[in-house]
Amino acid sequence: MLGQIRATARATAWPVRVIRRDIVPRCGPMGGVYTALKTTRKEAVLFLACDAPFVSIQLLDRLVQKFQAARGAWFIAHQGRVGFPFLLPTRSLTVVARQLERGEFSLQSLAVEVKGKRFSLPRSMRLQLQNVNTPEEWERACRMWRRRRVTEPAHSARQRKPSAS
């Protein structure tokens, strides 16, 4: 599953990093967010979940386009909540550090604290937000993956100047 997510990320032609060990452990996704922001040299970081194999290049492009139009934190909202993928400017590091100090590990709180902008996906793209966490979900994901129509092959990286990593 991580291989598929990595292939999609690499197909964007943007720099890709996989965070394997958090600087601040046992903080859920916030540990990885802190680690990525602390260690990047880029203006912003686009965060993907390791358990969401259906995210497409088109969805990632939407996030980056939103960021390019209005520099700031961008979150996808679904059913009133935010989650992966999302994009944070590197300047969000101080807010993330404060949240960790307070023991707040929620992405919902992060979106509020960074004054993140939210947008919803059209119905046709919502399947991409599906997480795979159990053997049953894995089996269902495999069936869906076999039926999935590929609109852009993962190996067809487009050439452009990266603005987020």
Q: Where do the protein language model's features map onto the residues?
A:
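Intrinsic disorder/low-complexity detector
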Residues: 133-135, 157
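Nucleotide and nucleotide-moiety/phosphate-recognizing core
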Residues: 1-104, 109-128, 135-149
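Hydrophobic helical membrane-anchoring modules
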Residues: 143-165
